[in-house]
């Protein structure tokens, strides 16, 4: 027996499943056998007594879960951090455990009343005493970890639980002697699994399969080379034996009904202390402020969910609800993260939702100077599509050239900020790093949920369940907006792929160009080639556009077209020479509509007009979309995503594709101001032209007054 190891237990005199506070209790209320529970507890008690000293705390009537002493607190040396139970059903246990600790000479530390921490159920010392593994996500809060590190003077490693079946750390994680670890990886998020793998070498990690995990194999008591646990598989026993451990199985089925096993029924009150281990915690906290229709537009819920989904924790410090229907609300929220890296990721996404630091916190953003052309500092802030302001010389400065996936370069005299692509960074540029001192300016979503309505519409169409009537309704709205934009002198840009030509949409797109609904055309080599092929030879990719069947030798048509245009020197020259007499490119030339054809590695030819320098093509695209009010994206995922990344917030984007994944992909890239239409692009253009023709009178602002 190990005389230096003491374990606290509590007899199950009043044990029963009286309520449901975890998934294991569901369906088991009052279905536990008191007789079998006592029998199983006594067997566990006897098994532990053979290898350690067992102390007992007297059970209190009315608190059936007091038998699970692992949740009494966390002990190191003469100090104990008392538990703050998450559920009211267990909060009455706290004074009984506190009394026992004080009677036995421990110094008791108590967390704030509203900060849950459930003791050694969510905090497990490395068996070598090197650090403390601390769980959070269901019962314990991340913000409790700095207190624990301070009071127990130890390093705390935070792990986030994501499977509600494993609501406490000790249900899926068991540090073993010799630096080994018994655990169930799917119970943790990706970041926590990386942390575990960085701390524990592969040969020391013993992974538990789900069959053993749900039988609480990880909820085991380890005393030196002995592991006391519920019944487990032969495979797991062999793994443990290979690592040098002796497994002692004892059935604990009655306690599984309440979501506990061997470890839950025990609390080790003698933990190893290393003199060179001191308080260390990587947790970082920041306060953010949000304003707007936080509740009815779902902004606050979205922000809080974002924090949790990214391994963080939060506490709402202050919330002021708007008193009128049109009033805005405000909130101050403290956000905590297990590391600086995670905090930066969370803050980057919160900024996109309009979160800002309290005004008194920051005067200037952090910057680093570029030392190598075309290379940003490691921690540079990546811009988004939303209008952005940054703090320069203690004032908010509007960022110019707003677009996605760029760095922000600032100057102090005069104060300015602009988005710059990585390749355009110059030595000496001051680039913003981190996420402090930045905010996005987003339009306030009304209580009517205007933006949300569009998002729902987008999701409905992208789900692939739209009817033809639904498409027609969307086309009517799009046509009306296009008419307004044209008649008010606005700008509409079209990004189109060759499918427009293949589906018979060339005549309709030509009509839009001719009638002044297109002010710039973006695409690739293919749309121009097949448009000219259709205009001059009546085929597209060798298919007769009238009969819909391939023609003999049609597979060579596009190469003949490329060769002919190259002979003339370009598309404009071919139009002027009369070789091209109709089609999309013809109308662009005749109506002086600028276009850019961006090349790719698969292009045949290419046409002389095709820009094969990708950097120059991107720059030209960016120039042509400046000042756009609407962008039509017609069956070209690659070009559409590229354009979406260059487009600032506020520009209406209409994505048309037969594949729902394309419009979803566009949304995932951050192009949230989008309307998705899942339909054949040729049909869409036909409906659009018909609807525009029905709007016979020019839109006039005067007529509405």
From Swiss-Prot:
Effect on the protein of changing residue 90 to A: Significant loss of arginine dihydrolase activity
Record: active site: 168 (proton donor/acceptor), 264 (nucleophile)
Residues reported to bind NAD(+): 525-526, 604, 636-639, 657, 680-681
One Gene Ontology MF term: hydrolase activity
CDD domains: SDH_N_domain
Catalytic activity from the UniProt record: L-arginine + 2 H2O + 2 H(+) = L-ornithine + 2 NH4(+) + CO2; L-ornithine = L-proline + NH4(+)
Residues annotated for L-arginine binding in this entry: 22, 71, 90, 139, 168, 170, 258, 264
Region annotation (Arginine dihydrolase) ranges: 10-269
Phenotype for residue 68 to A: Significant loss of arginine dihydrolase activity
Record-linked Pfam families: ArgZ-like_C_1st, ArgZ-like_C_2nd, DDAH_eukar, Saccharop_dh_N
Disulfide links within the chain: none
InterPro entries noted in UniProt: ArgZ/ArgE-like, ArgZ/ArgE-like_C_1st, ArgZ/ArgE-like_C_2nd, DHS-like_NAD/FAD-binding_dom, LOR/SDH_bifunc_enz_cons_dom
Site (Key determinant for dihydrolase activity): 71
Regulation: Arginine dihydrolase activity does not require a metal cofactor.
Domain observations: The N-terminal domain (NTD) is responsible for arginine dihydrolase activity. The C-terminal domain (CTD) is responsible for ornithine cyclodeaminase activity.
Its job: Bifunctional enzyme involved in a cyanobacterial arginine utilization pathway that enables cellular adaptation to nitrogen fluctuations. Catalyzes the hydrolysis of arginine to ornithine, with the release of ammonia and carbon dioxide. Then, probably catalyzes the conversion of ornithine to proline, with the release of ammonia. Is highly specific for arginine and cannot hydrolyze citrulline, dimethylarginine and other amino acids.
Stated name of the protein: Bifunctional arginine dihydrolase/ornithine cyclodeaminase ArgZ
Organism: Synechocystis sp. (strain ATCC 27184 / PCC 6803 / Kazusa)
Lineage of origin: Bacteria, Bacillati, Cyanobacteriota, Cyanophyceae, Synechococcales
């Amino acid at each position: 027996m190990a005389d230096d190891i003491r374990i606290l237990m509590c007899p199950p005199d009043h044990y029963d499943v009286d309520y449901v506070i975890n998934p294991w209790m569901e369906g088991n209320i009052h279905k536990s056998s008191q007789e079998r529970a006592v029998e199983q507890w006594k067997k566990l008690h006897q098994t532990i007594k053979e290898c350690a000293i067992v102390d007992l705390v007297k059970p209190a009537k009315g608190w059936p879960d007091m038998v699970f002493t692992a949740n009494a607190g966390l002990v190191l040396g003469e100090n104990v951090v008392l538990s703050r139970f998450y559920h009211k059903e267990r909060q009455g246990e706290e004074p009984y455990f506190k009394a026992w600790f004080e009677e036995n000479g421990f110094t008791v530390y108590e967390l704030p009343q509203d900060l849950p921490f459930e003791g050694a159920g969510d905090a497990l010392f490395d068996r070598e005493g090197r650090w403390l593994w601390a769980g959070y996500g269901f019962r314990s809060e991340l913000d409790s970890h700095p207190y624990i590190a301070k009071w127990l003077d130890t390093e705390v490693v935070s792990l986030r639980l994501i499977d509600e079946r494993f609501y406490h750390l000790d249900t899926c994680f068991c540090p073993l002697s010799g630096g080994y670890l018994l655990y169930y990886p799917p119970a943790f998020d990706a970041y926590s699994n990386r942390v575990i793998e960085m701390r524990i070498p592969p040969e020391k990690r013993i992974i538990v399969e789900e069959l053993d995990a749900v039988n609480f194999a990880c909820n085991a008591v380890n005393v030196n080379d002995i592991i006391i646990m519920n019944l487990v598989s032969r495979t797991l026993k062999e793994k443990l034996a290979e690592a040098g451990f002796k497994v002692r199985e004892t059935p604990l089925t009655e306690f599984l009904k309440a979501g506990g096993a061997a470890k839950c029924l025990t609390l080790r009150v003698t933990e190893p202390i290393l003199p060179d281990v001191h308080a260390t915690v990587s947790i970082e906290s920041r306060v953010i402020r949000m304003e707007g229709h936080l509740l009815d537009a779902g902004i606050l819920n979205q922000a809080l969910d974002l924090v949790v989904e990214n391994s963080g924790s939060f506490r709402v410090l202050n919330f002021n609800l708007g008193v009128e229907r049109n009033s805005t609300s405000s909130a101050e929220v403290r956000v905590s993260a297990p590391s600086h890296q995670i905090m930066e990721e969370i803050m980057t996404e919160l900024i996109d939702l309009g979160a800002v630091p309290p005004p008194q916190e920051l005067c200037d953003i952090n910057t680093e100077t570029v030392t190598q052309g075309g290379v940003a500092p490691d921690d540079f802030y990546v811009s988004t599509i939303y209008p952005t302001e940054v703090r320069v010389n203690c004032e908010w400065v509007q960022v110019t050239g707003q677009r996605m996936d760029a760095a922000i370069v600032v100057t102090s005299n005069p104060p300015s900020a602009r988005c710059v692509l990585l390749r355009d960074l110059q030595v000496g540029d001051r680039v913003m790093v981190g996420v402090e001192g930045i905010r996005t300016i987003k339009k306030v979503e009304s209580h009517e949920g205007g933006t949300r309505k569009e998002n729902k519409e987008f999701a409905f169409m992208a789900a692939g369940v739209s009817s033809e009537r639904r498409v027609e309704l969307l086309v009517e709205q799009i046509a009306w907006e296009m008419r307004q934009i044209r008649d008010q002198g606005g700008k509409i840009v079209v990004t189109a792929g060759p499918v427009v030509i293949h589906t018979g949409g060339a005549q309709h797109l030509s009509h839009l160009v001719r009638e002044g609904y297109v002010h710039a055309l973006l695409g690739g080599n293919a749309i121009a080639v097949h448009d000219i092929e259709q205009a001059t030879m009546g085929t597209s990719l060798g298919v007769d556009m009238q009969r819909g069947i391939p023609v003999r030798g049609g597979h060579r048509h596009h190469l003949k077209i490329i060769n002919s245009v190259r002979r003339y020197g370009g598309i404009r020259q071919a139009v002027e020479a009369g070789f091209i007499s109709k089609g999309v490119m013809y109308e662009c030339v005749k109506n002086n509509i600028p276009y850019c054809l961006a090349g790719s590695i698969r292009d045949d030819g290419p046409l002389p007009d095709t820009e094969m320098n990708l950097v120059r093509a991107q720059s030209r695209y960016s120039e042509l979309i400046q000042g756009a009010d609407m962008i039509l994206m017609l069956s070209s995922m690659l070009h559409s995503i590229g354009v979406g990344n260059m487009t600032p917030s506020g520009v209406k984007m209409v994505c048309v594709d037969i594949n729902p994944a394309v419009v979803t992909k566009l949304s995932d890239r951050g192009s949230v101001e989008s309307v998705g239409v899942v339909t054949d692009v040729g049909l869409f253009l036909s409906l659009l032209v018909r609807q525009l023709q029905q709007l016979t009178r020019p839109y006039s602002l005067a007529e509405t007054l």
